[in-house]
Design a protein with these regions (language model features):
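Bacterial Sec-dependent N-terminal signal peptides
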Residues: 1-26
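Mature catalytic domains of secreted/periplasmic carbohydrate-active enzymes
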Residues: 24-457
Length: 457
């Protein structure tokens, strides 16, 4: 049995490494068409604080991490899903559920995670308490399909993983976010075993089985209440995935008022469900084409997938910094997806890139954090932000991979008053303005990296 499991894992690792990019692009959440501003003053205040942070981490971790495959989606029987040749759908699904008996992150070290991401300059975190597969990364009372009950880690004193993750990040000053999937494919009241499961939604008629749906709504409300009721401390963000089910269908409107008694100003992110419970938008693996004037976040992966995969192809630090500059200039935040390994740590290859990002932010972060949009926000590879007082502007030159810094930077509009400070090394340089065009000659000796400038208007 163990040999068979190992063979299956090796086979899957190779297959899904090749398929990861295809799967990633086959289904991503687009942003909602519109935005509804919340009316609660505490939520508005929390959103303003969150918009100061700019850079966060979104951690996917669960059963899918064991073989290193696309998170949850492989048990969804849709046309774009890739599984090993010859495997039956039901056989594969049972194999996947069986990973709950294998998942054993003996090196689980949330303090290491918090150190790594704080050093990377990240200011908020979102952790997957439950993905679509239904496997709970917290000690829920409402199902045994959880890390705290189903497998070998159930005997570990840190079996209530979400609690230990949240508790490790709070002392570092992070805003704390709980990811929760509204669909639960393991729950019999969502995918009932009496019927086949051909698609991601419920597999029965609610009109014919209203009691089943009521059971599911109660189950979901109970789990959300567990997470937000105080047992896991004060939360800042409730990040709800699975936009084919709306929050109000599963009782979110009843949960939030009680949750906000424990966590005043709790930001609700009912993804892609335009309305009062989507307090910020979340375009996935993309950046909006233009500036937006309401709260939003691009959630994007460091590698090719959300969870850990073997031999990942990571984005460079330079690329992440350039994307972060574009996002902040357009008014958003970046939640960067980094998945812990099956045994519970952040892998070294990811740490190297994150350290490089953090080193840049320690020198140039003034051009990112606590900024707001300005009317003229882009000129070629230059992205502009403004300080909150509107009197100081920042420009970040997004240096592409494989290219060297130019000797000078030029742009139109946003005319500096006085000298320009190069945040990378703190030196002041002259800005030459002629016919509405600004030219800044860069000082010698700069590292070959994105450049951040600061100047007054």
């Amino acid at each position: 049995m163990l040999t068979t499991m190992k063979q299956m894992l090796l086979s899957l690792a190779g297959l899904f490494a090749a398929a990861a990019l295809f799967a990633q692009n086959s289904f991503v959440h687009e942003q909602s068409d519109g935005y509804v501003w919340p009316e609660d003053p505490a939520v508005l205040e929390k959103l303003d604080q969150w918009q100061d942070l700019k850079f966060g981490v979104l951690m996917h971790w669960g059963l899918y991490s064991v073989p290193g495959i696309v998170e949850s989606w492989n048990i969804c029987n849709e046309d774009w899903i890739t599984r090993p040749e010859g495997s039956t759908y039901e056989g594969y699904k049972q194999w996947y559920w069986g990973l709950s008996k294998v998942f054993n992150p003996v090196h689980f070290n949330p303090e290491q995670w918090a150190d790594v991401f704080a050093d990377a300059g990240m200011k908020y975190m979102i952790f997957t308490t439950k993905h679509h597969d239904g496997f709970c990364m917290f000690d829920t009372q409402y199902t045994d399909f959880s890390v705290a009950k189903a497998g070998p880690f159930a005997d570990n004193p840190k079996k209530d993983i979400a609690k230990y993750v949240f508790d490790a990040f709070r002392p570092k000053g992070f805003m704390i976010g709980a990811y929760f999937s509204k669909p639960d494919w393991h729950c019999e009241w969502f995918w009932n075993p009496y019927y086949a499961t051909p698609r991601r939604g419920i597999n029965y008629s609610v009109e014919q089985h209203p009691d089943w749906w009521k059971n599911y709504v109660d189950f979901t409300k109970n789990q959300l209440t567990e997470l937000t009721g105080g047992r896991y401390g004060r939360l800042d963000i409730l990040w709800l995935d699975g936009g084919w089910i709306t929050g109000d269908q599963v009782g979110l409107n009843e949960v939030l008022p009680e949750a906000r008694k424990v966590s005043p100003g709790l930001i609700s992110v009912d993804r892609t469900i335009q309305g009062p419970n989507e307090n910020y938008q979340t375009p996935e693996q993309s950046v909006p084409k233009t500036q937006l004037k309401h709260p939003w976040e691009s959630c994007m992966t460091l590698g090719t997938d959300w969870g850990w995969t073997p031999n990942p192809q990571f984005k460079t630090a330079r690329r992440v910094i350039g994307t972060l500059a574009e996002i902040t200039a357009k008014g958003g935040c970046l939640a960067l997806g980094v998945g812990p390994t099956p045994d519970g740590v952040i892998e070294d290859k990811a740490i190297v890139i994150l350290q490089e990002i953090g080193a840049w932010l320690r020198r140039c972060g003034e051009a990112i954090y606590n900024t707001r949009i300005t009317d003229h926000y882009n000129d070629g590879r230059l992205w502009f932000n403004a300080a909150k007082d509107g009197k100081t502007l920042y420009a970040v030159y997004a240096l592409p991979d494989g290219e060297n810094l130019p000797a000078e930077l030029t742009w139109t509009g946003n005319l500096p008053k006085g000298k320009v400070t190069v945040l990378n090394n703190g030196k002041k340089v002259k800005a030459v303005v002629k016919d509405g065009q600004v030219t800044v000659k860069l000082p010698k000796g700069l590292a070959n990296e994105p450049i951040a400038l600061k100047f007054s208007l």
